[in-house]
């Protein structure tokens, strides 16, 4: 029997509609719409698409998107100068620096220059530290989006074994913290993990964020599992797939996210929700 689908498009549409009403209410009360600064350095094709999608999503819910498209040769000093201006601006509630950055710019340094209360990506060490200490405020968008998906479908991770494949700062590490916060027993696997198959086979929840296709063999999967595929890869024919072979996996597990249409839409709506949350906090 095929797996049940975890539909990120449907759930994100519901959350966007709710967020749109919240923004409208605040505007009708005489407050300005939340403002999100979206900074793109260079013209990497994937980044251009991601930024365009984020700007369109802002427009859809009534959040004001402020665009800053900078040339690839922009210096780190110039970028820091812009961030400082955005940190001080009363019109900006959230700052998003589209990653990856050009090689001559230190990503960690740039993230640390963003005010934690405007860090709507949730990457600042302060915000990650709050999550680690079980007192989160602005949380990384993809992991929180995944948790919201699981909550909607009443897929409870408490007392379950969750295995996270991938240990990046953007997904894997904060994902493990979110799962711990929700009461799961968590195993993190990465490029140095030996006997990966063993960990995959005993997972109740499997979150795959390797950035590579087919690291997880389909025959390792089990029929009771909930599989969250964070990967996104464009194939030569123009189609998109995840880290896992969906057509095979959907026949083996209990629940699975499609790619596209699973995690991606939830990441974007969570970014918008973080911007709304930041705006509310800054008005206090």
From Swiss-Prot:
Catalytic activity: (6R)-5,10-methylene-5,6,7,8-tetrahydrofolate + NADP(+) = (6R)-5,10-methenyltetrahydrofolate + NADPH; (6R)-5,10-methenyltetrahydrofolate + H2O = (6R)-10-formyltetrahydrofolate + H(+)
Alphabetized InterPro entries for the sequence: Aminoacid_DH-like_N_sf, NAD(P)-bd_dom_sf, THF_DH/CycHdrlase, THF_DH/CycHdrlase_cat_dom, THF_DH/CycHdrlase_CS, THF_DH/CycHdrlase_NAD-bd_dom
SUPFAM superfamilies the UniProt entry points to: Aminoacid dehydrogenase-like, N-terminal domain, NAD(P)-binding Rossmann-fold domains
One Gene Ontology molecular-function label: methenyltetrahydrofolate cyclohydrolase activity
CC per GO annotation: cytosol
UniProt record, GO biological process: L-histidine biosynthetic process; methionine biosynthetic process; purine nucleotide biosynthetic process; tetrahydrofolate interconversion
Any Pfam family the entry gives: THF_DHG_CYH_C
Pathway: One-carbon metabolism; tetrahydrofolate interconversion
EC number annotated for this UniProt entry: 1.5.1.5, 3.5.4.9
Keywords: Amino-acid biosynthesis, Histidine biosynthesis, Hydrolase, Methionine biosynthesis, Multifunctional enzyme, NADP, One-carbon metabolism, Oxidoreductase, Purine biosynthesis
Binding-site list for NADP(+): 166-168
Keyword set includes NADP: yes
HAMAP family registered for this protein in UniProt: THF_DHG_CYH (MF_01576)
Quaternary structure (record): Homodimer.
Function as written in the Swiss-Prot or TrEMBL entry: Catalyzes the oxidation of 5,10-methylenetetrahydrofolate to 5,10-methenyltetrahydrofolate and then the hydrolysis of 5,10-methenyltetrahydrofolate to 10-formyltetrahydrofolate.
Family to which this protein belongs: Belongs to the tetrahydrofolate dehydrogenase/cyclohydrolase family.
Descriptive protein name: Bifunctional protein FolD
Taxonomic classification: Bacteria, Pseudomonadati, Pseudomonadota, Gammaproteobacteria, Legionellales
Gene: folD
């Amino acid at each position: 029997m095929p797996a049940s689908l975890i539909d990120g498009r449907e759930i994100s549409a519901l959350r966007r509609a709710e967020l749109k009403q919240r923004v409208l209410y605040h505007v009708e009360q005489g407050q300005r719409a939340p403002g999100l600064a979206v900074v793109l350095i260079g013209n990497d094709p994937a980044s251009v698409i991601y930024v365009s999608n984020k700007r369109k999503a802002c427009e859809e819910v009534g959040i004001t998107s402020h665009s800053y498209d900078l040339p690839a040769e922009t210096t780190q000093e110039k970028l820091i100068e812009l961030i400082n201006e955005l940190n001080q601006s009363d019109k900006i509630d959230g700052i998003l620096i589209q990653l990856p950055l050009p090689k001559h710019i230190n990503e960690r340094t740039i993230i640390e220059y963003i005010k934690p209360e405007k860090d709507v990506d949730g990457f600042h060490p302060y915000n990650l530290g709050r999550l680690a200490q079980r007192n989160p405020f602005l949380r990384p968008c993809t992991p929180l989006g995944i948790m919201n998906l699981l909550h909607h479908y009443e897929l409870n991770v408490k007392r379950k074994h969750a295995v996270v494949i991938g240990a990046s700062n953007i997904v894997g590490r904060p994902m493990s913290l979110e799962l711990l916060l929700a009461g799961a027993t968590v195993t993190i696997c990465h490029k140095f993990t030996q006997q990966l198959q063993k960990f995959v086979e005993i997972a109740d929840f499997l979150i795959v964020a390797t950035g590579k296709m087919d690291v997880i063999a389909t025959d390792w999967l089990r029929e009771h599992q909930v599989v969250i595929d964070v990967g996104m890869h464009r194939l030569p024919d123009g189609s998109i797939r995840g880290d896992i072979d969906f057509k095979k996996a959907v026949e083996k597990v209990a629940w699975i996210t499609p790619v596209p249409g699973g995690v991606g839409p939830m990441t974007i709506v969570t970014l918008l929700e973080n911007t709304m949350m930041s705006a509310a906090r800054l008005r206090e």
